[in-house]
Amino acid sequence: MLTDSFLDYLRYERNYSEKTVLAYGEDISQLKEFAQDEIGEFNPIEVKPELIREWIVSLMDKGYTSTSVNRKLSSLRSFYKFLLKRGEVVVDPLRK
């Protein structure tokens, strides 16, 4: 799975701490759960910017601070940068 490959990349090639790797994985899982609730599925290759915006709004509605939301977005930016480098996606849904 793409998420597992990304987390292994962080763990073994980037030497991120296990705590950081787990946090990145949790951030991706949160988006996955949101996507499944909203559109019935999660395929990181097909995520659209609109879904990301809706997810951000839902996080803010749940009381997440802007700092926490930005950290989650940073995790997702890293994930999509990884996918772009591997040729898995051609468009980054987080790119402005």
What name fits each language-model region?
Residues 4-19, 25-96:
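N-terminal core-binding DNA-recognition domain of tyrosine recombinases/integrases
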